[in-house]
Amino acid sequence: MSDEKLSEIWYTRCPVPTPVGLAAQLGYLEETFAAEGIALRSIIDSPDPAIRQSHFNHTLNWSFRHGGNVPPIRARSEGRKTRLVGITWTDEFQAVITLPQTGIRSVSDLKGRRFGIARRPEGIVDFHRATALKGLVSALSLEGLSHRDVEIVDVAVRDSVLDKFGDASLFGLRRRPPHGEEIAALIRGEIDAIFVKGTPGIAVANLIGAVLVADFGFHSDPNIRVNSGSPRLLTVDELLAEKRPDLVARLIEAIFRASEWAKAH
């Protein structure tokens, strides 16, 4: 244990159910670090965009994150000193959908058709695009096809995943329903199919009366199911891991407490 005195520690999580989110809501995280004289600060609640972007690129010292795996993988590949300390896996709805008028009814029907994938501005990692690409690859593999068997059409999205001018109460993220641009392109006939996931994906599919081309979020093969949210990663910055491993241990204890609470309720 280091003698270095800390006054605050930063945390962040994706806006989906996670053990870290539950531990924060139950007060376990704040209680854990308060016992060490350390204040708990939320990265995504900060009014400072430079701090909020650490949710995606893990640039902030003395911080930890629990969420999708694409940002930490990208951050690590770019030389960020981030360390993996835990993995959770929660399966969710993943599907390729289309509209009735396209005539697409199965994965094999996707061959030669236009698959729309959103493309956001360069800068912060476009994890939405990575997620859709993996979803496409998984769906096509069910019928022995690859991404080369379809025409990938970029659907331009003006906003980055991080809105630097956003209201901090929205965590600096665009909280409008997802897939808006892709759905619009689908309705205009500019593309033939898209990937959706999670409860928002179910809502979108029902809203437009979509045809379910492939549903693989609960497939028996984990290589098919794996995507940005499966698994989710618990990461800490290198300084925290090396200088205060005792705090990392306390963090994991708090997360386990939240898990036990969830099992009991």
Feature locations, PLM:
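Short, glycine-/small- and polar/acidic-enriched structural segments
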Residues: 4, 8-147, 152-156, 163
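Glycine-rich phosphate-binding "P-loop"
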Residues: 37-39, 168-171
